[in-house]
Amino acid sequence: AGPTTSIREEPYQGDIMRWFGIRGVIGKGGMADKTLAACKEHGAVYLHAIGGAAQVLAECITKVRGVHMLEEFGSPEAIWEFEMKAFPAVVTMDSHGESLHKDILAKSEDALAQRR
């Protein structure tokens, strides 16, 4: 149940969302513009979960509905369908095209520019 670094999936995350009807992606580290556009197009969200907390996260899974591409990608990278309750995650990319990752990057760049 522990999240994996998401940016590795960036090149094809939009296709995966379309093919499997995914409305939520759980990971850590954030995603980029292609995934943000796919979230907007498919009414989906990116959920940033806590790395290193697999046991806590696993306790929130109430049912495994299915798994796809397990042989191709292995367990950590497979596409898992879960039912969850009280899953501790932060929505950092939403279906309106908003990205907390982009917002924080812009604020950080502004703060650093003011120090120069």
Describe the function of each predicted region.
Residues 13-14, 91-116:
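Active-site/ligand-binding-proximal alpha/beta "capping" segment
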